[in-house]
Amino acid sequence: MAINAQEISALIKQQIENFKPNFDVTETGVVTYIGDGIARAHGLENVMSGELLNFENGSYGMAQNLESTDVGIIILGDFTDIREGDTIRRTGKIMEVPVGESLIGRVVDPLGRPVDGLGEIHTDKTRPVEAPAPGVMQRKSVSEPLQTGLKAIDALVPIGRGQRELIIGDRQTGKTTIAIDTILNQKDQDMICIYVAIGQKESTVRTQVETLRQYGALDYTIVVTASASQPSPLLFLAPYTGVAMAEEFMYQGKHVLIVYDDLSKQAVAYRELSLLLRRPPGREAFPGDVFYLHSRLLERSAKVSDELGGGSITALPFIETQAGDISAYIATNVISITDGQIFLGDGLFNAGIRPAIDAGSSVSRVGGSAQIKAMKKVAGTLRIDLASYRELEAFTKFGSDLDAATQAKLNRGRRTVEVLKQPVHKPLPVEKQVTILYALTHGFLDTVPVDDIVRFEEEFHAFFDAQHPEILETIRDTKDLPEEAVLDAAITEFLNQSSFQ
């Protein structure tokens, strides 16, 4: 058999042409330090800031510090199996979380993994946790109200869709209750709610989830939880995960309410990470970019232009103060980023005034333009009246004689305080808020004993539901008050047949 050299060379040539190398090139490094949710690695020459990295044990990390000799990495998950000398690989991707409709009604961790025991979440959509906020020309001014169902907020410090309203106060002053009540009030309001629990006790989160489920609010709510027992990288990441999920809905033209409970714990977690990464500490040992930590998060809440779908993200960030000190570092940072704040005083809370909103220190910078006409008319002077009542009340403690005008102001003030009280998890529709506040500001409650105000209000709402539903309907549909004579006649009719006259 003759060997044909030409055939053999053609065959070899064909084999070479058809050869496909079965390998992929991945840049790897070596772990040089591990501990407290932080790793350092050598050899990742081209890694990007914020890039996702893969450890040998399957855990992921995120590149934070890019230094001349090594890379500082925060570990997202369990770091107990990682050892010095382990190999670490680049993924070439930045941190992304699952988003979309299938997350609604679920409880997830900051990586988007379910923690409620209800099985896998099936979604093929993801969004990066860090994303640029909408630009100046991509935004619209706040014009639609977000009804919290709480008289004290909707009347005194109204919130609009797309606003950032800080809720600030000491621990145990009812901050979370305000947020949960606001979420409950979004039922049938075409809103999606996201509750981000940062550094909370797991038992507390369980209680909140059960409350939401009991009132049917879990049907339109996503809960993101990073409990106190989890490593600080997850606490740092949780708010960004929540807002990434919210952005998916906002850019579809939907309206979202997101609650960050609370950002003080996120700042503490970030301080811990920064100190472990050897970043230079600043005031109160926080790193220099702690303002940017919160500003880049809260700037992603907006009312976007019609070209982008006209959706919105309304943010309710929480800050916990120490002994009512709202001039602390993190508190003043967040106050300067947000569009107003609701200050909860422990003195008011302990005196039984709940929600314990301090009208003097609370403000809504843009919510006034979103308030409905009816509420503007009845609550126009309520803030000033309440503030002057508190001032007068302080003076009366000295026991001086009072003229009739001052006495009338004090009487109206006491009734105002009683009307603005509200039981837990009982948000009130805006049309009912308007009717009771109208009765208050037009002097119909001046003869009702202060101790009977709560009972008066219950019977008052029941009367309007039964006898005058058309008045409530008019307020709900037109967003304005009906003729004053109609309202006055209805309230007088109630007073005549009640025991309060």
UniProtKB/Swiss-Prot annotation:
Reactions catalysed, semicolon-separated, are: ATP + H2O + 4 H(+)(in) = ADP + phosphate + 5 H(+)(out)
Cysteine disulfide links: none
Q: How does it sit in the membrane?
A: Peripheral membrane protein
Name where it's found. Cell membrane
Write the Enzyme Commission number(s) for this entry.
7.1.2.2
Keyword annotations for this protein, in alphabetical order, are: ATP synthesis, ATP-binding, Cell membrane, CF(1), Hydrogen ion transport, Ion transport, Membrane, Nucleotide-binding, Translocase, Transport
Report any Pfam family annotated for this entry: ATP-synt_ab
Q: Which domain of life is it from?
A: Bacteria
In its UniProt record, a GO molecular function of this protein is: ADP binding
Q: Which SUPFAM superfamilies match?
A: C-terminal domain of alpha and beta subunits of F1 ATP synthase, N-terminal domain of alpha and beta subunits of F1 ATP synthase, P-loop containing nucleoside triphosphate hydrolases
Q: Which residues does this entry assign to the site Required for activity? A: S362
The UniProt record lists the keyword Coiled coil: no
Main localization (coarse): membrane
Entries under InterPro entries matching the protein: ATP_synth_asu-like_sf (IPR023366), ATP_synth_asu_C (IPR000793), ATP_synth_asu_C_sf (IPR038376), ATP_synth_F1_a_nt-bd_dom (IPR033732), ATP_synth_F1_asu (IPR005294), ATPase_F1/V1/A1_a/bsu_N (IPR004100), ATPase_F1/V1/A1_a/bsu_N_sf (IPR036121), ATPase_F1/V1/A1_a/bsu_nucl-bd (IPR000194)
Residues that coordinate or bind ATP: G169, D170, R171, Q172, T173, G174, K175, T176
Q: Name one GO cellular component term.
A: plasma membrane
Does the keyword section mention Cell membrane? yes
| CDD domains given in the database record | ATP-synt_F1_alpha_C, ATP-synt_F1_alpha_N, F1-ATPase_alpha_CD
Functional description taken from the UniProt entry:
Produces ATP from ADP in the presence of a proton gradient across the membrane. The alpha chain is a regulatory subunit.
State whether it acts alone or in a complex, and with which partners, per the record: F-type ATPases have 2 components, CF(1) - the catalytic core - and CF(0) - the membrane proton channel. CF(1) has five subunits: alpha(3), beta(3), gamma(1), delta(1), epsilon(1). CF(0) has three main subunits: a(1), b(2) and c(9-12). The alpha and beta chains form an alternating ring which encloses part of the gamma chain. CF(1) is attached to CF(0) by a central stalk formed by the gamma and epsilon chains, while a peripheral stalk is formed by the delta and b chains.
**What is the protein named?**
ATP synthase subunit alpha
